[in-house]
Amino acid sequence: MGKIFFYEDKNFQGRSYECNSDCSDLSSYFNRCNSIRVESGNWILYEQPSYRGHQYYLWKGEYPDFQRWMGFNDSIRSCRMSPYHQGQYKMRISERGDFQGQNMEFFEDCPNTYDRFRFRDIHSCNVFDGNWMFYEEPNYRGRQYYLRPGEYRRYSDWGASSARIGSFRRVHHIF
């Protein structure tokens, strides 16, 4: 079981809320979130209720301001624990929607998709094993998209507004 603390102000000040399970709407517990302490577990945070909006992946540690978790603002409205995965990682990406066009399989992290293959956009993806994180920019920067095993027929299925993915990596658990 995981535990995460949300604070309204920077440097772990102001009103706080302790959470130890998935929560689809945090808005009744705090108005804004400017710092976070993850005591245990790995968490995916969302800017909007019902697990929507910008996503942020956090693990055990202290985040004294929202820029430390690559946040764009002080809005965190839902959270869920990342399920633990043991074993292989496997994902197939496609240059077009509905798994059309050129396909490539990956078992390892990719810090720069532009250097790795000829197409710059990922329009669909099938995650076979493990949990993965897509990033809009190379070197694991920019907006984050958390992917669990399953089919993603178009980029909007993983919450993106465009098909641009600059890097991706396997989600490893840190406790």
From Swiss-Prot:
Record GO terms (molecular function): structural constituent of eye lens
Residues covered by region (Connecting peptide): 84-88
An annotated GO BP: lens development in camera-type eye
Transmembrane annotation, as ranges: none
PROSITE patterns: CRYSTALLIN_BETA_GAMMA
Residues annotated as domain Beta/gamma crystallin 'Greek key': 2-40, 41-83, 89-129, 130-172
Superkingdom, natural source: Eukaryota
InterPro entries: Beta/Gamma-Crystallin, Beta/gamma_crystallin, G_crystallin-like
SUPFAM superfamilies the UniProt entry points to: gamma-Crystallin-like (SSF49695)
SMART domains according to UniProt: XTALbg (SM00247)
UniProt keyword annotations, A-Z: Eye lens protein, Repeat
Quaternary assembly: Monomer.
PANTHER family named in the record: BETA/GAMMA CRYSTALLIN (PTHR11818), GAMMA-CRYSTALLIN-3 (PTHR11818:SF133)
Record function comment: Crystallins are the dominant structural components of the vertebrate eye lens.
Family: Belongs to the beta/gamma-crystallin family.
Free-text domain note: Has a two-domain beta-structure, folded into four very similar Greek key motifs.
Name used for this protein in its record: Gamma-crystallin-3
Source organism (scientific name): Xenopus laevis (African clawed frog)
